[in-house]
Amino acid sequence: MAESMKGLKRTHRCAELSAANVGEKVTIMGWVQKNRNKGGLVFVDVRDRSGIIQVVFEEGKSEAALIEKAAKLRAEYVVAIVGTVAKRSGAVNDHLATGEIEVLPEELRILSESETPPFHIEENSKTKEEVRLKYRYLDLRRPDLQRNLIMRSKVATLTRQFLAEEGFLEIETPVLIKSTPEGARDYLVPSRIQQGQFYALPQSPQLFKQLLMCSGYGRYFQIAKCFRDEDLRADRQPEFTQIDMELSFVDVDDVIEVNERLLAKLFKEVLGVEVSLPIQRMTWQEAMDRFGSDKPDIRFGMELTNVTDVVKDCEFVVFKNAIENGGTVRGINAKGQGGMARKKIDKLVDFAKDYGAKGLAYIAIHEDGTVKSSFAKFMTDDEMKALIEAMGGENGDLLLFAADKNKVVWDTLGALRLELARQMELLDKNEYKFLWVTEFPLLEWSEEQNRFTAMHHPFTMPMEEDLQYIDSDPGRVRAKAYDIVLNGNEIGGGSVRIFDQDIQSKMFKVLGFTEEQAQEQFGFLLTAFKYGVPPHAGLAYGLDRLVMLMAKQDSIRDVIAFPKVKDASDLMTEAPGHVDAKQLEELGIAVVAKEEKKDDAE
């Protein structure tokens, strides 16, 4: 039966104790990590979120009843122990912060017993993630997950402190909002009072933070919960957290400057890492041309080389056709990989096909200078020599080429570059390389929808010098948009916003909105623009992804207390679940089963 902690008050967390506390009487409380009974001598490791301390029950130093009680302790029992801190009688444990000391107890209370847990609570558990997520409250006891959440809390606290000192106001925006179909799917919430109508959960506080600028608040921030009904992957969740901000009377440089100082503070105070300022900047066009990605990992080289002009007159039909169809030929140089086995090269070809490429052409330069190529017979010796020279090829190098439309070539070689970096172990997790990517295209063409869509969102300001093309050549227009990239991951993005009614109307028109549709969906914002709008800009970080990278984790699930899995379900609470028919009736909702598509043969 559980004992009361009445009369006891915890004096220290377990790992707060040190050699400086020797001789002090202390009260510790926590979970039993391990219990070792050596007959008349019982060692109990007690754990809380700060760490572990060893408690020693020994004949001659502890009462027999106390030793007997300690021998019955099991893993995850919750205990309170009163005792004296002493130097360890045995060997020092260098693996523990408290490894020099132990506690000699005079009182033990069992506050709560535990059944045998489904897995051992330990660092870097090898237990299947599905099991750990089902018992997440146990999983969260593990020291590595606790460190991640402690780090997350510290990042949030430091962010609040920094932004408050910079004159930002923390203002909450609504969670029940109007649905706008542009972009990813909304989560919808039915209204009981206004049946047949729905709220949406926000994908970001975008419109409200712009309205706060219209309202004269100047500098806003919020650590905001956001929601997106989309297919999940390692770095996405249906509900996620943003560090969101907006500033008035600023331009691109102002937003970048304050955020560079924020990042420098976070990395210095949380990780002890100095961020060199100013952070490097690169236009979207340069990033795509050099790295095949708008979020390039610049911890390593292996940049793309455009060899279109070098091979434009060759007879290799793959290169020839791509160039004639308005495409390009580009390559990457995998240094030292010239001896790669053909089977591995074939796997790289298959990898490339996943990104839309029809294949990969290659030149393998062996250490002895001999050249093996998939297309040598279609090239003259001089053409081959010129191509190798253009690629910076040396003995021992593997040159890989893609030829197609720009997007296919960029996507293929950008992904291949990262895959080779992983295989060649070029990625250092202890290195943090930041990059600003700027001047994104304002719009991108959607083949599926047969229209332009906003690359960021419909409220992004075009660059002044490109405004002249918004009607005649919208695909040419660049945006005053910027993303902050860390080690090949976009951790934040923002833009200068449109604050001119005419430009906003043109933007809606290019996106295919009629005046009525624009008014229906964004009328409140357009009306606000009639009453004096300051120039404004903002940025939002994905807090989950930022902490994931700072904590050197591979999934954001490891930095979120209660995450969802890939089908957007919660294995612990079994959400989503069915609801009572009466609740649906109150909402005026009937659930209709999806009809299965009939086989054509039927």
Question: Locations of the language-model features?
Answer:
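Class II aminoacyl-tRNA synthetase catalytic cores and aaRS-like
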Residues: 1-602
